[in-house]
Design a protein with these regions (language model features):
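Single transmembrane alpha-helix segments in multi-pass membrane proteins
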Residues: 48-101, 106, 122-127, 267-277
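Alpha-helical transmembrane segments within multi-pass membrane transporters and channels
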Residues: 100-140, 145, 185-186, 290, ...
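Membrane-interfacial amphipathic/re-entrant helices at transmembrane-helix boundaries
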Residues: 32-63, 99-104, 166-170, 174, ...
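Transmembrane alpha-helical segments in multi-pass inner-membrane proteins
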Residues: 236, 240, 246-313
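Helix-loop-helix "hairpin" substructures at the membrane interface of multi-pass membrane proteins
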Residues: 116, 174-259
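Transmembrane alpha-helical segments of polytopic membrane transport and secretion proteins
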Residues: 9, 20, 30-43, 325-347
């Protein structure tokens, strides 16, 4: 129901008299340009939201790179990220509000995430707890930790007006946010490309590829897993610190569903750029671009009128769909191979 609905309804069912019908038709023609203007205004609002969606997508893309390390390289499901993301935001906001240098606050956010990843790694490797359960345990513990960091408050604001000169990213300055996010993405990908090209990086990749063979070659797989958890959650917390600056507050629940968004970004990047991006650095970039595409799609869906409450359900459906694609492809390939084998057997 909008401003022009009465006119449209009246024209759809005109009054008995021809004069009444002509009157409605005349006014419908008069307001038609305004209907077009309304549509153009909606499209303009969507286009104006794109830079913000790109900036936010890049921030979440950094988080997706962290998830990429455990999910793709170590072949482990780590649910710590839902907690460590909020930890990074909480540490950043509290430190910045306390007068700390913003770069030092970002570093502390990263280290807090590394500590969370270390705990998960120890629970998994030293206590024999499955990775997914170890991540859940750490995530639950981090909820209380995040509340303590924010002095028992569920939400801690960070005024963009008061700290506008020191914040690296902010909703009030999208252009600066895009540049800063681009720099962070480039530096992180460059550092990870270098790291995974070292002997330690190769051993970490070997651990995720084939643990038994890695152990046979004298690689300490337990230590490598801990390192992977540490690096992954450090990047996730760094992303949380950037998002806290961008939105102007830290919330104890800001990381809820982060793992799903991270998986969505990785899968979208793999589906869209998988055949083009073969290099390791480009695969990391694909995860970031997947996050950007995800948030552009979210903006478009909201523009179409989908209730914001349904976004989590939509994200879960998209992730489930794309995770099932490889399975379906395998089943189809099996059906094609079997008839070919039967033909050869008959021959």
């Amino acid at each position: 129901m909008n401003l022009f609905s009465p006119f449209v309804t009246a024209y759809a069912v005109p009054p008995p008299s021809s004069e009444g019908g002509m009157f409605v038709l005349h006014h419908l023609k008069a307001i038609r340009p305004y209907c077009g203007f309304e549509r153009n205004l909606k499209m303009l609002s969507f286009l104006s939201s794109l830079p913000g969606a790109v900036a936010q997508g890049a921030i979440w893309g950094i988080m997706a790179v962290g998830v990429f390390i455990t999910y793709k390289i170590l072949d482990l499901a780590d649910l710590t990220v839902d907690g460590s993301f909020g930890t990074g935001g909480a540490v950043l906001v509290v430190c910045t509000a306390g007068g700390m240098n913003i770069y030092l606050a970002m570093l502390l956010s990263l280290l807090a995430g590394c500590a969370a990843g270390f705990v998960t790694g120890v629970l998994h490797t030293k206590f024999g707890i499955p990775a997914i359960l170890a991540g859940i345990l750490t995530q639950i513990a981090l909820y209380s930790v995040n509340l303590r960091i924010m002095s028992g408050k569920a939400n801690q604001p960070l005024s963009a007006m008061k700290y506008r000169k020191i914040l690296l990213v902010s909703l009030r300055n999208i252009n600066k946010s895009l540049i800063v996010c681009g720099i962070f993405v480039a530096v992180i990908i460059a550092l990870l490309y270098w790291f995974f090209g070292t002997e330690l990086g190769h051993s970490l990749r070997a651990t995720g590829c084939n643990q038994a063979m890695a152990r046979a070659n004298g690689i300490n797989t337990a230590t490598n897993k801990i390192i992977g958890f540490v690096v992954s959650n450090g990047l996730v917390a760094l992303s949380g610190g950037l998002l806290a600056q961008y939105q102007g507050f830290a919330d104890v629940n800001m990381g809820r569903g982060a793992i799903v968004i991270g998986l969505a970004a990785i899968i979208i990047g793999d589906v869209v750029f998988g055949k083009i991006f073969k290099n390791f650095a480009l695969k990391l970039l694909g995860a970031v671009l997947g996050g950007v595409i995800y948030y552009i799609v979210i903006s478009f869906v909201l523009w179409l009128g989908l209730p914001a409450n349904d976004l989590k359900m939509l994200t879960a459906a998209v992730v489930a769909l794309f995770l099932g694609v490889p399975y379906w492809k395998g089943k189809i390939a099996e059906k094609r191979v079997k008839p070919a084998e039967e033909v050869k057997a008959d021959a």
